[in-house]
Amino acid sequence: MATTLATDVRLSIAHQTRFAFRLASAISSNPESTVNNAAFSPVSLHVALSLITAGAGGATRNQLAATLGEGEVEGLHALAEQVVQFVLADASNIGGPRVAFANGVFVDASLQLKPSFQELAVCKYKAEAQSVDFQTKAAEVTAQVNSWVEKVTTGLIKDILPAGSIDNTTRLVLGNALYFKGAWTDQFDPRATQSDDFYLLDGSSIQTPFMYSSEEQYISSSDGLKVLKLPYKQGGDKRQFSMYILLPEALSGLWSLAEKLSAEPEFLEQHIPRQKVALRQFKLPKFKISLGIEASDLLKGLGLLLPFGAEADLSEMVDSPMAQNLYISSIFHKAFVEVNETGTEAAATTIAKVVLRQAPPPSVLDFIVDHPFLFLIREDTSGVVLFIGHVVNPLLSS
């Protein structure tokens, strides 16, 4: 992508980051999060909701834009265009991560998309528009959408639409799918991997495989938090993808950290490590997470209510009197993240720069990820967060 981003796009990315951390905090506040790992793709959800905003009118459009952090919907579309065309462009042919992203609009054959919506969806969101028969072939369309997602995510996401989720009352399905596979710049030696104790939130421990390294690492340490940056191999463009491990010092500090990030999105930028440091000990657990959610309740908790009810105004999507009766019944989202010695495989479907005054880390420290932590995958040049989640038990995969 371009070496510089316009100020308005950077501001939109800051809003997107805030949306990401608000969602992460909402997911972590779920009682099930105390015993289950979680992962989701904020950029996937953000793009999907931005596309819905393009087809919304009146108060519904305003509420969508406000939830996504934008006062003007044009900012959402400009950001989506940058994200889809540049941030999420594949870099495997130039030595970088394998990235695949696709948007889809599946509309019932009885309806016609409004030309203005279709043009925006195709030109800015690079969406593929397909006419389908929900009214008599709902099961076949379900299989078609699931097959599309499975193909984009190279088989990692299956059955995004549960059986029965589409029926003869469905008129429109908007979706996207994201796949990411990156290799670490400095890979771990699998021969050094060995099991050790990981402490759960209840104070008990389990034996789980840890990756070890004696190399210097990008680490910051302050405010009761240690942050590890693991860069992925960079391609021949300006993008730089990295995974971040956010480890609170306190065993039970995961939830307060999630709340802190939600309240102060700039907190992450202030703690991103800028230099490598020598380590006395370093160990990071391998983990794999697969999570499927129906996201409408989460979004309602963030104040997004109108698109899901009788007052929804999605009249800018289709050319039909029926447009006044359209509303969103559900938003399905699935994510998969795997971290091992060679790198990360991940998939999902559905700013003024801070001046840092970061204290230099100690010359030698430990980074031992032996209790619950947050993680995220970010494109550092733009600041776009692709995936975010938490691990409370590395042995749980779903």
From Swiss-Prot:
Which InterPro entries is this protein grouped with? Serpin_CS, Serpin_dom, Serpin_fam, Serpin_sf, Serpin_sf_1, Serpin_sf_2
List membrane-spanning regions. Answer: none
**Mind listing the UniProt keywords for this protein, alphabetically?**
Protease inhibitor, Serine protease inhibitor
Under Pfam families, the record lists: Serpin (PF00079)
Statement: the UniProt record of this protein carries the keyword DNA damage: no
- Annotated coiled-coil segments of the chain: none
Alphabetized SMART domains for the sequence: SERPIN (SM00093)
**What terms describe the molecular function in GO for this protein?**
serine-type endopeptidase inhibitor activity
GO cellular component terms listed in the entry, alphabetical order? extracellular space
Site description Reactive bond, residues in chain: 357-358
Ranges where the record places region RCL: 343-367
Domain comment from the record reads as follows: The reactive center loop (RCL) extends out from the body of the protein and directs binding to the target protease. The protease cleaves the serpin at the reactive site within the RCL, establishing a covalent linkage between the carboxyl group of the serpin reactive site and the serine hydroxyl of the protease. The resulting inactive serpin-protease complex is highly stable.
Q: Which family does it belong to?
A: Belongs to the serpin family.
PANTHER family in the record: SERINE PROTEASE INHIBITOR, SERPIN (PTHR11461), SERPIN-Z1C (PTHR11461:SF317)
Q: What does this protein do?
A: Inhibits chymotrypsin, cathepsin G and trypsin in vitro.
What protein does this entry describe? Serpin-Z2B
